Amino acid sequence: MGIIKDRQGFTLIELLLVIVIIAMAVAVAAPNIGSGNQTASLNAAAREIASALRFARGHALTHRKETVFLLNLEGNTYQLTDRKKVYKITKDIAVTLDAAQSQIIDKNQGGIRFFSDGSSTGGRITLELGENKRQLDVNWLTGQVEIDGW
């Protein structure tokens, strides 16, 4: 019996080395997967609120009457005047509002008013989730909405 020189397959050492490399890659990638979900959730909330603000501005322009975006910080909800539906923001997201004093109802409620010419009272809505933060700025002169922090 001779020694077989052309054996096909992998040695135990080679297989263990591949398993160690895969384990290291998973250990590095796993923490980033969770933060990606947080970022996606925060971005989605920012886009939804920005869309509602833009809708409020458009509604004020087309119907030639004031429209108010109302934000409830305690309940993490918002709604528009002339609409009964209350929209929810994920409870994990911390929301703050910096608005004109005339639009502050109490410490937990306030809003941004859009006028029939497209202008507004202006303001900033800040969304925070973990270390991630998004700011929605409403220009008082033009009523335009921008999202900062992408």
List the model feature ranges, each with a label:
Residues G2-I4, L16, M24, V28-R54, ...:
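N-terminal helix-rich module
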